[in-house]
Amino acid sequence: MFAHIYRADGREENIELDYCYSDEEVATAVCEDGDMGGGDRAIVCVTRWDGTQQRFRHRMVRVAVKGNEIHLVSNTVDRFVGTIE
């Protein structure tokens, strides 16, 4: 899996992730592998190969780091998913 990170401060970054089954796993992996710290916000475009349909799949995940807590955020939801160690 690949993740393209669009940070709120304007920086962009590409990282390779181990396979993640949920948005929560993506958020945690991006925060750990993408070197995000307290106060960072980002939109993450996750790309993976779908072998059954022989095409790439994309999904967007919004991540915010509050202190050392990782949150999935949207216009209506702010969900705690883990902590940065």
Language-model-detected regions and their locations in the chain:
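Short aromatic-glycine-(Arg/Gly/Cys) micro-motifs in beta-strand/loop hairpins
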Residues: M1-E12
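Short low-polarity hydrophobic stretches
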Residues: H4, V26-A27, L72, G82
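A short, exposed loop/beta-hairpin motif centered on an aromatic-Gly-Thr core
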Residues: R11-Y21
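Short, mixed-charge low-complexity intrinsically disordered segments
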Residues: M36-E85
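A short, charged, amphipathic alpha-helix used as a generic interaction element across diverse proteins
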Residues: Y21-G39
